[in-house]
Amino acid sequence: MNRTAYCFDLDGTLTTVEILPCIAAELGISEEIATLTRITMEGLLTFEESLRLRVAILGQVPLQTVHGIINDIQVDPRLSAFIQSRPDQCFVVTGNLDIWVNQLIERIGCGGHTSLATAKNGVISLRHILDKGEAVKSIRNRGFDRVIAIGDGSNDVPMFRAADTAIAFGGTHSPMPAAIAESNFVVHDGDALCKLLNTL
């Protein structure tokens, strides 16, 4: 039997909003972080450079506050239902920090691959920035014959290249040109995405 793994980007793919601008609103700089997020998704700034900068800025927000903000973030109900119907085959693959998003991934109800960080005395230190391509290889090595990747930004390109099938998803906003260029399918609606996933 063919075993398929489904790898989902988190921000703006599974969630109905981008997470980091929501955290930035606590500091009154949501527009600035949204701009930084956008130029990163467009590939104008490397994900590593952008993440280090965003962590340095947003690390000022207490973890408890971050968890409260993320707890209020909605997940696309159609994608959530798809994942919950096959949790052992689904994975969140996000460059976001484990200490910020682990509770959200638990709520989604599947495995997750994240960037790693520690928090000590109110200071966040990055330990490891996730390589999405390596995450897909790691997931494949768990005994999956096929990997389908779903994302929306240029930072999803390594995941798309390592997968067998790549889907650029525009659920929250249009997928970036780099993601579209590496994709096999482009979908703009959660219902359409679930139908496609069920037929692949």
Feature names for model-found ranges:
Residues 77-200:
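C-terminal cap/substrate-recognition subdomain and adjoining C-terminal extension
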Residues 2-120:
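Alpha-helical substrate-recognition element adjacent to the catalytic core
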